[in-house]
Amino acid sequence: MSVVPVADVLQGRVAVDQEVTVRGWVRTRRDSKAGISFLAVYDGSCFDPVQAVINNSLPNYNEEVLHLTTGCSVVVTGKVVASPGQGQSFEIQATKVEVAGWVEDPDTYPMAAKRHSIEYLREVAHLRPRTNLIGAVARVRHTLAQALHRFFDEQGFFWVSTPLITASDTEGAGEMFRVSTLDLENLPRNDQGRVDFDKDFFGKESFLTVSGQLNGETYACALSKIYTFGPTFRAENSNTSRHLAEFWMLEPEVAFADLEDNARLAEAMLKYVFKAVLEERADDMKFFAERVDKDAIARLERFVSTDFAQVDYTDAVAILERCGKTFENPVFWGVDLSSEHERYLAEEHFKAPVVVKNYPKEIKAFYMRLNEDGKTVAAMDVLAPGIGEIIGGSQREERLDVLDARMAEMGLNKEDYWWYRDLRRYGTVPHSGFGLGFERLIAYVTGVQNVRDVIPFPRTPRNASF
């Protein structure tokens, strides 16, 4: 007798007639007039529960089995047999059922109902992984993360752990969470009456990171190919389906790479991870296609088999101006493309994923390489049908004088970035990278509309529960 995951039973990795033990939670119990009960037991290892067939001859049948309800935890031992019923190949003929934990009051159990609104589930985020939806999201999230690590490992990249606490603003937007141990009731002041951060824990004003990119560049300029993958933070007061205050970012950086290399890497990476999730999470993707977004599987299959289009920002604006469509947000050269513009390009004009590149310098960050025209930078956004921007990246500015000039234009103090500037002083190289918002990737794969539902415990304005 061995303990096995439910997935091994349902996917035929356990021999028929072998005695096994599965451990999990009751999804449903059904009783027949013939004195047999059917328990659907899940353990999270796959989408479907396994059916345990329990005869009333078991010694605890009347006292315990007949009182099991949704959410109770059980340990079921029995023989794996071919299932005569529709919908599953194998089931367990139980010889022993142990109750590990009861649900105190089945009538008030928050997960008792079969269907819950997505808004309600956010209020019980500690219990929502027990639902079909959030359980499937969690498994897909895991598979995507593992596929990303696998892809970069196979490509010769090194994973670098960049700090979560920083004194630098990568984006230059100032939307950062301050980190401080100062006494809010008795703040130290300097001669100008401002808060004296010299007295703070780090001896300077410090923040939660908005990106690992700048730190990542330092390692790319020594190890050649690296990536970072971890949480990032934006103190942006946005209550939308696309924004979180805490989210995960994947950021590769490659030395001796230009913008074209960057675009090729992004395309290869996305196709790799989409192929992985289609192959490894077929049961979960089937659920998303049936219950969440009927195009979920077909969308990824199209993506994997379609070459990316490329277009310069200037040409993209011309396409939008000539298309005859009325947009909510006006289109003109110099505007940052909105989601509706991005989706028109990907879904209606190119009908494919598209890389928009060479944006006006005024709407992009200081570290992006200035093009020869002096007006645009070597930036790129990857736009995907169905969502719009999924990746943002650029070739980085490797020329110290140009970098300093861009910092001055944007009102940044170059002394705050002395270590970043050192990379341009000691053996500078062209290099490129991009950022992928992990939650937006998961939303795209699953068809789940709100990024709050693809991260275990969402952090949003006025919400840091659990």
Swiss-Prot record:
Entry-linked PROSITE patterns: AA_TRNA_LIGASE_II (PS50862)
How does the record describe its quaternary structure? Homodimer.
A Gene Ontology molecular function term for this protein is: ATP binding
Under what name is this protein listed? Asparagine--tRNA ligase
InterPro entries for this protein: Aa-tRNA-synt_II, aa-tRNA-synth_II, aa-tRNA-synth_II/BPL/LPL, Asn-tRNA-ligase, Asp/Asn-tRNA-synth_IIb, NA-bd_OB-fold, NA-bd_OB_tRNA
Which enzyme class?
ligase
Localization recorded for this chain is:
Cytoplasm
> What family name appears in the similarity comment?
Belongs to the class-II aminoacyl-tRNA synthetase family.
Task: Name a Pfam family for this protein.
Answer: tRNA-synt_2
Q: Which domain of life is it from?
A: Bacteria
Q: Does the keyword Transport apply?
A: no
Q: Where is the signal peptide?
A: none
Q: What is its EC number?
A: 6.1.1.22
What broad class describes the main subcellular location of this protein?
cytoplasm
Which keywords does UniProt give here?
Aminoacyl-tRNA synthetase, ATP-binding, Cytoplasm, Ligase, Nucleotide-binding, Protein biosynthesis
Encoding gene, per UniProt annotation: asnS
